[in-house]
From Swiss-Prot:
Keywords: Cell cycle, Coiled coil, DNA-binding, Metal-binding, Nucleus, Repressor, Transcription, Transcription regulation, Zinc, Zinc-finger. It comes from Homo sapiens. PANTHER family: AGAP005574-PA (PTHR46927), THAP DOMAIN-CONTAINING PROTEIN 5 (PTHR46927:SF1). GO terms for biological process: negative regulation of cell cycle; negative regulation of transcription by RNA polymerase II. Detected in heart. Detected in brain and muscle (at protein level). Highly expressed in the heart. Also found in brain and skeletal muscle. A zinc finger (THAP-type) spans 1-84. One of its GO terms (molecular function) is zinc ion binding. SUPFAM superfamilies: Glucocorticoid receptor-like (DNA-binding domain) (SSF57716). Residues 85-112 are annotated as: Disordered. This is THAP domain-containing protein 5. Interacts with HTRA2; under apoptotic conditions. Interacts with ABRAXAS2. The gene is THAP5. A motif (HCFC1-binding motif (HBM)) lies at residues 321-324.
Length: 395
């Protein structure tokens, strides 16, 4: 059963947080009632009755009340604990209360931006983006044709007022110049683009968008958007391409927009769909699909590279561990190594035969000497001792 301190505001326990400092635990003086009363008074627990399994740690005693002998701290017989912290002092230090206060503050912080975003959404819900066109009106009769494009919904509270100036450049001088009136309405969930023009067989439209004060500070440069509409032979089909050129000369081509328009007169009118993305809007479906393709391609290339790296690592390990399994070595070189090994084996066999012959000759000599009584047991022991001492000195 682990020991722990019985004081109210003390969390010391044996085996925990005792690496930097030494803690010792002392039992209550149950047999000395006067001393026990002093302990309980200092602890502010007069009515409490401790048991023999409860202890106080050394943090509650002064150094004078401890007797150190052979590195062990013993409690003196007259020692009384005097160092105690009241629960009122530790109310501010309670971690559970601190955590609850932090949670309350976080909840308040979360509620405040939500309320602010709702208020800004209500205020900005009726704002619109207005487009002004500077085109000379020479012909009062206009044929209206409209096309609706739904851009992705921007985030709440980020609706902005942008001003667009359009300048038309007519290629066919024989026909009257066309007039273009556009209006952009952007809400949080809907987006529309309405165009009214005539005689746009082959025109180039240049849109210069100047950012207003409410636009994000990161988009400080102006952007030029060029839309080219080329009318085909088929009266019910137009091919439109749109390109954005930023001030940093980093153009990127939007997806080609193909639209089929019913009951369209080739000589008088054509339809163009212009998609103007908001700054904080979400990416379109085509860009999302292309991004997914890019990510999958990158993942495939990473997997292939990792596989190639694993194969290279495996070949390196094989080349290091098994010197005869290298792919760089030719067969001729391997056969040369095999022949060298065979020659070494034959040399070892010859040496073995020579040593065996010498041993047999020595055994024959010893037998002959024993038969002729040239060697007695004493002489044999002397010779054996001589050989053993010689071997020891050699070792």
């Amino acid at each position: 059963m682990p020991r722990y301190c019985a004081a109210i505001c003390c969390k010391n326990r044996r085996g925990r947080n005792n690496k930097d400092r030494k803690l010792s635990f002392y039992p209550f003086p149950l047999h000395d009632k006067e001393r026990l009363e002093k302990w309980l008074k200092n602890m502010k627990r007069d009515s409490w009755v401790p048991s023999k399994y409860q202890f106080l740690c050394s943090d509650h005693f002064t150094p004078d009340s401890l007797d150190i002998r052979w590195g062990i701290r013993y409690l003196k017989q007259t020692a009384v604990p005097t160092i105690f912290s009241l629960p009122e002092d530790n109310q501010g230090k309670d971690p559970s209360k601190k955590k609850s206060q932090k949670k309350n503050l976080e909840d308040e912080k979360e509620v405040c931006p939500k309320a602010k975003s709702e208020e800004s959404f209500v205020l900005n819900e009726t704002k619109k983006n207005i487009v002004n066109t500077d085109v000379p009106h020479q012909h009062p009769e206009l044929l209206h044709s409209s096309s609706l494009v739904k851009p992705p919904a921007p985030k709440t509270g980020s609706i902005q007022n942008n001003m667009l100036t359009l300048n038309l450049v007519k290629q066919h001088t024989g026909k009257p110049e066309s007039t273009l009136e556009t209006s952009v309405n952007q809400d949080t969930g809907r987006g529309g683009f309405h165009t009214c023009f005539e005689n746009l067989n082959s025109t180039t439209i240049t849109l210069t968008t100047s950012n207003s004060e409410s636009i994000h500070q990161s988009l400080e440069t102006q952007e030029v958007l060029e839309v080219t509409t080329s009318h085909l032979a088929n009266p019910n089909f137009t091919s439109n391409s749109m390109e954005i050129k930023s001030a940093q000369e980093n153009p990127f081509l939007f997806s080609t927009i193909n639209q089929t328009v019913e009951e369209l007169n080739t000589n008088k009118e054509s339809v163009i769909a212009i998609f103007v993305p908001a700054e904080n809007s979400k990416p379109s479906v085509n860009s999302f699909i292309s991004a997914q393709k890019e990510t999958t391609e990158m993942e495939d290339t990473d997997i292939e590279d990792s596989l190639y790296k694993d194969v290279d690592y495996g070949t390196e390990v094989l080349q290091i561990e098994h010197s005869y399994c290298r792919q760089d070595i030719n067969k001729e070189h391997l056969w040369q190594k095999v022949s060298k090994l065979h020659s070494k084996i034959t040399l070892l066999e010859l040496k073995e035969q020579q040593t065996l012959g010498r041993l047999k000759s020595l055994e024959a000599l010893i037998r002959q000497l024993k038969q002729e009584n040239w060697l007695s047991e004493e002489n044999v022991k002397i010779i054996e001792n001589h050989f053993t001492t010689y071997e020891v000195t050699m070792i």
